[in-house]
Design a protein with these regions (language model features):
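Terminal-region recognition feature
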Residues: 1-167, 173, 178-180, 184-204, ...
Length: 274
């Protein structure tokens, strides 16, 4: 049935249609490919991380503005990153989750603006920021506009350091600029046999140095957990990674002006003060 947007009922119906389109922006084939690897979608990760029913999405109708290389013919809602606010154990947090099923999770101009906005919101409201990272770096089709947004994100990571907790979860292959930002945050969580962090991939390493190296050797979860020290926790799977972050936040203050949470001890202790 055609929607008449000149009526109140029509406007509400049109809003519902667009929300549904934003929630289901990713191609079905890309989602099937993601699930075949045992991975959640970007939105499923956010909903699994946050308290049930607490997520409020921001800028779900955002779309890229690029007209280069035929990009104007493919303008999905969200532009490849889910952003918003929610709660973990009742405490507010800000979160973004990069969507590898849309443009390979690459960061474009609008995509980067959404991430900058959610970082600004986290700092302004004094709540932790959690980034779920998976993607191939800069969106080449958007050129320097994409690269400029990386600079904006790095600047915000630096300014937020020591002000709010910043936690990064690497949920798949993350390359280029999409690993610089996590390296500037306080904690990095990676998933065994699933996550990789590297500046550039094995093919480029082979071309430049002549060395054959696998994804896992170059930037796998075990490499960064046991060799480089970039990763602070090696998760068994995505559920484990998300649950670890939920637990981690119970030890951290909301921001630099608050004390860490204090809990009653439910168990009797044999310790005595002398």
């Amino acid at each position: 049935m055609e929607i008449d947007i000149h009526t109140t009922a029509g406007k509400i119906a049109d809003l519902g249609r667009r929300i549904d389109e934003a929630v289901n922006a990713a191609p079905a084939a890309a989602i099937d490919k993601q699930r075949a690897k045992g991975k959640m979608t970007a939105r499923e990760r956010v909903l699994r991380l946050l308290d049930e029913g607490s997520f409020t999405e921001v800028d779900e109708f955002a779309r890229h503005r690029s007209t280069n290389f035929g990009m104007e013919r493919n303008r999905p809602y969200t532009d490849g990153v889910v952003t918003g606010m929610g709660t973990i154990h009742g405490r507010p947090v800000c979160v973004f989750s990069q969507d590898v099923t849309i443009f390979g999770g690459s960061l474009g101009e609008v995509n980067g603006e959404k991430i900058c906005k959610i970082i600004d919101l986290a700092v302004k409201t004094g709540c932790p920021l959690i980034g779920i990272n998976e993607g191939g770096g800069a969106r080449i089709q958007e050129g320097v506009a994409s690269l400029a947004r990386f600079g904006d994100i790095f600047k915000r990571n630096t300014r937020a350091s020591g002000v709010i907790p910043q936690i990064s979860i690497i949920m798949g292959a993350a390359a280029g600029g999409q690993v610089y930002s996590p390296a500037l945050t306080d904690f990095i969580v990676m998933v065994d046999q699933s996550s990789q962090m590297f500046i550039t991939g094995p093919a480029v390493v082979k071309a430049v140095t002549g060395e054959d190296v696998s994804l896992e050797e170059l930037g796998g979860a075990r490499t960064h957990s046991q060799v480089s020290g970039n990763s602070h926790y090696l998760a068994a799977n995505e559920d484990d990674a998300l649950e670890y972050v939920r637990d981690l936040l119970t030890y951290l203050p909301q921001n630099n002006l608050e004390d860490p949470p204090v809990y009653d001890d439910d168990e009797e202790s044999d310790l005595t003060i002398t």
